[in-house]
Amino acid sequence: MKKIEAIIKPFKLDEVKEALQDVGVQGLSVVEVKGFGRQKGHTELYRGAEYVVDFLPKVKIEVVLADDHVDAAIEAIIGAAKTDKIGDGKIFVSPVEQAIRIRTGESGDDA
């Protein structure tokens, strides 16, 4: 099993969720996060004063999948989240040793 963590622009969340559902993903977790990458921050003007915004709002999606579903999920995320502009986000894939469904005690791919 693998865990996919995708950091995306918030307005792309619905499109990414639908794209993942289309490739068979049955569940995911979403967390609102702030961060910066190469794009750094930006300046905003508010009531005549200029402010530097260092951390930009993003959304982190977490999905745990069987190994044979990972490539399709990654392609779905990229296809739905890509705007061809700086700040589109990143995808991280890491191994998951074990998953257990609390209610039933099922483990592995059944969890």
Predicted regions and their residues:
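Positively charged, small/polar-rich N-terminal and surface patches that mediate targeting and assembly
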Residues: 1-111
